[in-house]
Amino acid sequence: MHNKRKVIATLTTIPSRMEHVHVTIESILNQTIKPDEVVLSIPTHSIREEKDYELSDEVKKLSDEGKITLLHCDEDYGPATKILGVLKREIDLDYTEDREPIIITFDDDKRYNADTITNLLSSDLIECGVVVCRKGSRIYMVDEDHPFHTDKNNGILERIYSGADESSVKRVDVLFGTGAVAYRPSYFDHDVFDYKSENEDFPEVSAFFVDDIFLSGYLSEKGIGIVVASFDKSPLQDKMATHVLDVNTQNSNVQPLGTINRTTPELGKETIKYFDKAYNNQM
């Protein structure tokens, strides 16, 4: 619990990463602020890999011991399943505003620093009605005649912020799911589960792979701010490269989403341009 709020940690994975996802789960279970529930949200069938899920022995053991909740989702929302699976369960529950839970999402290819949840919650920024993350970025759109415009970036520039390198809270446009992110259910409406149905121009296929950009743009439209919390580096983080907060697991080399985003950059660009009001800072 944190400020009398239940803390729900949640992540998703793909079938090819099931074998090693327990490493990430164990790092979540070993946080200095213990989550009240750790949820592995998975659909029956993976759209990305076109195959059904089969639980690993390690995940079965964690579930059988009551250490995690297996949440079987009706739909595959891609990487966003980590938030949308739990959100679908929580969004209609009768919470008062000061008692609704905190949902913290994690990626499936990191061994998270033990103070990750502390980094997100210790400043109580979550009580201000904002999304809190450890990493994020600001997006800048520039015209073709701008000196920073290139054919490669298509006029979309990004500045990354890591809470371990900042002395104060920073407002950002894009949350980085890799660093873990804290939300409250009231930040969302039901349209997040089928955004395309009410927004026919929404690039649904592209957004499936760039959940950070979709969720950030969606939240901006709802008037929800996103901030990067400031925190002290751990001794291990002090030895890491710039913007690196957590150690990769073996899953970082298994079907990495970053490869898809690098080889098909139009996925992110299409989604950014759809939410252009959220991503239109001036330089």
Q: What kind of feature is each model-predicted range?
A:
Residues P43-E100:
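Active-site-proximal specificity loops/subdomain of glycosyltransferases
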